Amino acid sequence: MSLHIPFEARYAALPDRFHAQLAPTPVSAPGLIKVNHRLARELGLDPAALESPEGVAMLAGNAVPEGAVPIAQAYAGHQFGGWNPQLGDGRAILLGELRHADGALRDVQLKGSGPTPFSRMGDGRAGLGPVLREYILSEAMHALGVPTTRALAAVTTGERVLREQVLPGAVFTRVASSHLRVGTFQFFAARDDLDALETLCDFARARHDPEAETALDLLRGVIARQADLIARWMGLGFIHGVMNTDNMTISGETIDYGPCAFMEAYHPDTVYSSIDRHGRYAYRNQPEIAVWNLAQLATALLPLIDADQDRAIEVATEAVHGFADLYQSAWLDVFRAKLGLATAREEDAKLAHGLLRLMAEAGVDFTLAFRGLAEGQEVARKLYAQPEIFDAWARDWRARLAEEGVDAETLTARLTSANPAFIPRNHRVEQAIQAGMAGDFAPFHTLVAVLERPFDDQPEHAAYMAPARPEEAVRETFCGT
């Protein structure tokens, strides 16, 4: 057993204005919560070594592995539409990059690892609750087939952090295709630093779009990835809650799970985040906000797209406007799969929207409504206060399926593979967090294990499928930073 970690330092090799180099701040008594064994092995790491005292010390920030060049990254961003020219990693430190089994590089970052030059008077630490939440949510999203940052490990620090109350401290090890954000490009564009912008564009293309030859190609790649990502969110009833430009990745991965939530009773205007008082990031608004964010990326890239500003604006605008068709196509692919359809017809959008309208009118649980389609009409119709309304929709659905000549067994397989039985329901996440705060991590471990197999029948965990009872319901979520 050894803790040899072959870190590369690609981003740390960029000029100093891209980052601040500093070591994590040690903690007093690091303790292991969980190491993600499968992900560790995919990164060429020995899980047992990570769980050793030496490994836990590294995961807590008490020891910097040989080859790592720890840095905090600089970026800016629009937060709820308001411009902030100086954000950056205020409580996170990038250790370096590792080569994944798929051949691509992955960032390895410690969150809650102490103050940095970007902390803006913060302590640079993370509470246990947000660390457990990000572990649960990011790994659940991965199992659900959504591009996302990953959870490699979570450790306690033996220290306390002061927020609205005193909380146990923790450090989260996040793995990502990169931590490049729309806000990273905005940071340099706002400073008219064309050299840095070109360097960043070259880095991003090499990392995420190796076939892209220009900044416009990079922009188009980001637009396509984000269209696919948002469609996947919508297909799960997922609400990110804080779609600021510093929380939109160039890679197309979901990042930063602070106030996110999964809808239970379906309504397109649903908001959970306590800080989203005007519903800017409501479920229905997510595609529109994605376009707004991508327009900010396009604006940042204008000097690299064409020396003629009018021409640059013209082609960048055309690229951003292309999001609508890409998103609509991806959304239809997602919802066709959720309806068990393997072919495309013009009327499919009407069929999907028709069911969503019924779900909204009846306040039906989003996840159970779609999973119920696999369990037969008698099960599905009972979710509605007026089952006959569902029956009318189901006749059109069955007629559409008949066009494909699909047999019952194949249909069931299609539906169960596209519609999860288990999602990280807000009350279950909260229960796991509260138990962990009291020193009991068993509910956390159980929930993580259940969510590793979201599409499988798990009769022994059937209770995890159920929506919250009124007294359990989580109606508001918090950033928790």
UniProtKB/Swiss-Prot annotation:
ATP binds at G88, G90, R91, K111, D123, G124, R174, R181, D256. InterPro entries: SelO. It comes from the Bacteria. Mg(2+) binds at N247, D256. It is an enzyme of class 2 (transferase). It catalyses: L-seryl-[protein] + ATP = 3-O-(5'-adenylyl)-L-seryl-[protein] + diphosphate; L-threonyl-[protein] + ATP = 3-O-(5'-adenylyl)-L-threonyl-[protein] + diphosphate; L-tyrosyl-[protein] + ATP = O-(5'-adenylyl)-L-tyrosyl-[protein] + diphosphate; L-histidyl-[protein] + UTP = N(tele)-(5'-uridylyl)-L-histidyl-[protein] + diphosphate. Keywords: ATP-binding, Magnesium, Manganese, Metal-binding, Nucleotide-binding, Nucleotidyltransferase, Transferase. Its cofactor is Mg(2+); Mn(2+). It holds the Pfam family SelO. The active site is at D246 (proton acceptor). Its EC number is 2.7.7.-, 2.7.7.108. GO terms for molecular function: AMPylase activity; ATP binding; magnesium ion binding. Nucleotidyltransferase involved in the post-translational modification of proteins. It can catalyze the addition of adenosine monophosphate (AMP) or uridine monophosphate (UMP) to a protein, resulting in modifications known as AMPylation and UMPylation. Belongs to the SELO family. This is Protein nucleotidyltransferase YdiU. The lineage of its organism: Bacteria, Pseudomonadati, Pseudomonadota, Alphaproteobacteria, Rhodobacterales. The gene is ydiU.
